[in-house]
């Protein structure tokens, strides 16, 4: 994106004082994507065959150029850092339906550098050298694109969302289950 995507810049673009923000909802895809060059630990977690399957399922190609986006499993380490930088209160998790065809779903829960676990995301460290620590979760292997209530989701999909909540220490309040505006699950009370 050519504009600043931090939550602190939203009021500036909207023409309202930033002190008027009551909530910040961090928006995260159910898997990781990256546009452009630079370190991206998630890209190397599962290999190019897995990445290509995910890229096709999620339609992860540049809107203007058609170039394939870099993809990988959900990265809890990078996401925790992003949520902290945003000052997010809650999370909207998008594209959960894209993972529906997977028997197992990898999640990056940590990094190792030279065999030693890295305690936190450091944007100035050797991110191009870190190795992702991957936890495999069961997939649900069924179409969830019609789900609009939490109780309609398969147990494995709910477990995936709850696993991410625990890893991120944030509530996931919204879960999108399709590209259409009405295809989302409100989990819990509205903000």
Which functions belong to the PLM regions below?
Residues 1-191:
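Non-transmembrane, aqueous-exposed alpha-helical and coiled segments at domain scale
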